[in-house]
């Protein structure tokens, strides 16, 4: 199937993938008086006295804003907020289908960090959570940080944290396949953008100790010239040996490669220099850093991609619906590191030891167990970490 051509035809037919529907009837005068004036005044007064009642007297408890500035949409780049709308609508469909979360797309026409943050903050009282989407780095880091400081509801940049959760889940099971331990494996990442930074931070939080990040200039290390603020921060907590050199140099004798960068960054010959039973996450889309057949020809044991036509797809739909479902179920004020790690462990645990293999380390997107398992684990972690409010 020509997905581009057929999708365009269907989008013209659909004229939008979501709609607002009423949950109550308005068929009689009494219906009208209860749903709207004069009866609606009473819940308004109750919320005025206690703002937390906005969660029980309105749909706020289940409503997520999916927000972009259109600056980093898929692999298309800075195409503008209006052009990002089909993706935001699609994300809202996935929230509902896989997590039962009502989501609403908002495309903001500003690339000024403070203007964007203030706009989102001013409307945050309508929502139970905020999902940031397709915002270019490094601006996305500052936007998320400032919103988390200002808002009392969860703020989650899925391009960062959803990808990180799935990667941690996959790597947890990949290491079982190859018989290696997180405390001793050496990990190299290609890319230093939003996804790579979040992946590395979550791996560090989970107990991985030997991680080296690479950008276009090679290894990132403390003291390297011309690092931006985010890379300087990452240099403080990665590459403790201050290894310098190219991506190819860093891969020699290392156990794990995680690519969230660009097509063709890795060759079969580079994989051959890695440690025995190498694990490869090659997640650039639609063309990966190295195709699975090439990686396996280079003796990789486990290979993951961002594509649905190969085994072990790194697909964020496994994470964000269940994460928000769990956060909403306990009215969490934040989505923190313990909640993300709990989501990753729940995903990894769905694959039994009997099922686990090099080609099956991550559950399928349509596995009906995924959403409930992630939601339950996230809700439990929210309670244990003190951010649950019910």
Model-derived features: positions:
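N-terminal ligand-binding/catalytic initiation module
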Residues: 1-155, 375, 381, 385-389
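Solvent-exposed alpha-helices and their adjacent loops that cap or buttress functional pockets
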Residues: 12, 55-60, 96-97, 122-124, ...
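Short, ordered loop/turn segments at secondary-structure junctions
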Residues: 69-71, 79, 108-109, 134-137, ...
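Glycine-rich phosphate/diphosphate-binding loop of Rossmann-like nucleotide-binding domains
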Residues: 74, 79-99, 157, 161, ...
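General beta-strand structural signal in soluble alpha/beta enzymes
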Residues: 105, 131-134, 155-158, 189, ...
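Adenosine-phosphate binding glycine-rich loop
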Residues: 158-159, 178, 282-390
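Rossmann-like adenosine-cofactor binding region
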Residues: 232-301, 307-309
